[in-house]
From Swiss-Prot:
Xref: Gene3D superfamilies: CD59 (2.10.60.10)
Protein's UniProt name: Cytotoxin 4a
Assembly description: Monomer in solution; Homodimer and oligomer in the presence of negatively charged lipids forming a pore with a size ranging between 20 and 30 Angstroms.
GO molecular function (one): toxin activity
Chief location bin: secreted
Record-level GO cellular component terms: extracellular region; membrane; other organism cell membrane
Recorded superkingdom: Eukaryota
Signal sequence region: 1-21
InterPro entries: Cytotoxin_Cobra (IPR003572), Snake_3FTx (IPR003571), Snake_toxin-like_sf (IPR045860), Snake_toxin_con_site (IPR018354), Toxin_cobra-type (IPR054131)
Gene Ontology biological process terms, A to Z: killing of cells of another organism
Family, as annotated: Belongs to the three-finger toxin family. Short-chain subfamily. Type IA cytotoxin sub-subfamily.
């Protein structure tokens, strides 16, 4: 009986995928934040003139369009930014 109960709990957790959340780097990549519901992309923003220096990183729901001055790079896996 205990085995059956344990099996049901494990199957429920696997099927519902409880607790899956995306993790995105903050400005300093050593630190990250767990994204709230609905924000399913990580992003990195930097100035086009200085592409090696990110200005901002975090979670976002829709990837913004880049402009002549600012470029956005978006991705959807943990700590990919």
């Amino acid at each position: 009986m205990k085995t059956l109960l344990l099996t049901l709990v494990v199957v429920t957790i696997v099927c519902l995928d409880l607790g899956y959340t995306l993790k995105c780097n903050k400005l300093v990549p050593l630190f990250y934040k767990t994204c709230p519901a609905g924000k399913n992309l990580c992003y990195k923003m930097f100035m086009v003139a200085m592409p090696k220096v990110p200005v901002k990183r975090g979670c976002i729901d829709v990837c913004p369009k880049s402009s002549l001055l600012v470029k956005y790079v978006c991705c959807n896996t943990d700590r990919c930014n």
